[in-house]
Design a protein with these regions (language model features):
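C-terminal ends and interior cores of transmembrane alpha-helices
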Residues: 102-120, 324-339
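Multi-pass alpha-helical transporter architecture, strongest
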Residues: 212-219, 418-444
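Glycine-rich segments within core transmembrane alpha-helices of 12-TM secondary carriers
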Residues: 161-185, 208, 383-395
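Extracellular/periplasmic helix-loop-helix junction of adjacent transmembrane segments
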Residues: 46-79, 126
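C-terminal transmembrane helical hairpin of 12-TM major facilitator-type secondary transporters
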Residues: 316-363
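Cytoplasmic membrane-interface "Motif A"-like loop-to-helix N-cap segments
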Residues: 90-102, 312-323
Length: 448
């Protein structure tokens, strides 16, 4: 195991080289960007994939089938979290993050090789489902590992700022996926896009995976994990899964509630809305993707500043502001989007994007702080992935089904409002972690 270039201060604090912190944050964020490029591509090309893999005369049925395969990957995420999380607490964060990178890239690359339904029939959607399950299993260890890695490297007083770069990477990945799909949609004919063009973004995952693996293999283990190993003086005893769940049940419930509001709103805006604009509101596909692309670019600009704000005012006030905003502004925002004009759609989507920044900026620092070092990766993986699987990843499928059953185009707003209520209760119950050491770890400061 690689050891970090950090020293112990006389008072017991961990003093880490700022250059090493930036390197760790950059590598984790870049790897996360590559992971979420894959998910972003699937989301933004969902309408085309529905025609390739799920032939039907009903566009809503095609979209529902495509999002069904999308949601299926989230059903195995908790299993991936139960495997990779405890493993990361035992053998190290860096090794597990390298494995998740390989698996995610392989699953995405495989999608680009699958023949269409017209070529092999029912085998096509079955192979798509298999590839999505590989992606979902690997992603079960991704976010918790990356956020844990950054949180354990960052100094206590700047953990919010450094953690915000993880979601900066997520947005960059989404923009890469959305930008590529938008470019192909504009340049290729419908026939070319359906016959071969849709494969290009998935095949790009091959070389991207190699780059991501290189970045993660160069990472060094966190000072907090290294200190845990030193305490054991030998092989670390295996922490029972029961201890990660039953021993942390209060923190797990808080984690699941926070992840619920974070991911329902995240997947609603970044994954579902492009297809909502095209399939349900009959909005021009290219214009819809460009609006979402612009919203994500705006979020990227604001993201680091919002992360730094959480270090000054705390995580709780920022998350609470996001919950209040989604509770009271979701209906006006969706009404604006439904107006259909470019300005109205941009204003509605932009408002939702700025509210989402309250979560993307605060959560990477707030969630790891719920658990002690010994079980942080494992417990966070379990809580995060169970919540994402039940509520976040299923958002496009559930909202599409609700609209189909009721005919009510305001369902996205109602769904976000319900999530905001759950998130508000979690904020009320959680403790403030800004500027404080992570549970089970020594205070962390940055050398100058």
């Amino acid at each position: 195991m690689k050891s970090p270039r950090a020293v112990r201060a006389p008072a017991g604090a961990t003093v880490t080289d700022p250059a090493l912190v930036r390197r760790a944050v950059k590598a984790a964020a870049l790897g996360n960007a590559m992971e979420w490029f894959d998910f972003g591509v699937y989301s933004y090309i969902a309408v085309t994939l529905g025609k390739v893999f799920f032939p039907s005369g009903n566009p809503t049925a095609q979209l529902l089938s495509t999002f069904g395969a999308f949601a299926a990957a989230f059903l195995v995420r908790p299993l991936g979290g139960m495997v990779f999380g405890p493993l990361g607490d035992r053998v190290g964060r860096q090794k597990v993050l390298a494995v998740t990178m390989i698996m995610m890239a392989a699953g995405t690359f495989a999608i680009g090789l699958i023949p269409s339904y017209a070529t092999i029939g029912v085998g096509a959607p079955l192979l798509l489902l298999a590839a999505r399950l590989v992606q979902g299993f690997s992603t079960g260890g991704e976010y918790a590992g990356a956020s844990t890695f950054i949180a354990e490297y960052a100094p206590d007083k700047r953990r919010g700022f450094f953690g915000s770069w993880l979601e900066f990477g997520t947005l960059a990945g989404y923009i890469g996926g959305a930008g590529l799909v938008t470019l192909m949609t504009a340049l290729l004919s419908t026939d070319d896009l359906l016959s071969w063009g849709w494969r290009i973004p998935f095949l790009i995952a091959g070389p991207m995976g190699i780059i991501g693996l290189y970045l993660r293999m160069r990472l060094e283990e966190t000072p907090a994990f290294a200190a845990e190993v030193e305490k054991a003086e030998a092989n670390r005893p295996k922490v029972p899964l029961r201890e990660m769940v039953a021993g942390q049940w209060k923190a797990l419930l808080l984690c699941m509630a926070l992840v619920l509001v974070f991911n329902v709103t995240d997947y609603m805006l970044l994954s579902y809305m492009p297809s909502y604009l095209t399939s349900e509101l009959k909005y021009d596909e290219t214009h819809g993707l460009l609006v979402v692309l612009g919203v994500m670019a705006l979020m990227m600009i604001v993201q680091p500043f919002a992360g730094a704000l959480t270090d000054r005012v705390g995580r709780r006030p920022v998350i609470a502001a996001g919950c209040a905003g989604f509770l009271f502004l979701s209906i006006p925002a969706v009404l604006l989007i439904r107006q259909g004009s470019l300005v109205a759609v941009a204003l509605g989507m932009g408002a939702l994007g700025l509210l989402l920044v309250c979560f993307t900026a605060a959560m990477p620092a707030a969630l790891p702080a719920l658990f002690p070092t010994r079980v942080r990766y494992g417990s966070l993986s379990i809580g995060f992935n169970v919540s994402v699987s039940l509520f976040g990843g299923t958002t496009p499928l559930v909202v599409t089904a609700l609209i189909g059953a009721t005919g009510n185009m305001m369902m996205p707003a109602y769904y976000m409002m319900a999530a905001a209520v759950v998130g508000g209760f979690a904020v009320w119950r959680m403790s403030e972690s800004a500027g404080r050491p992570l549970p089970g770890s020594a205070p962390a400061v940055e050398s100058h």
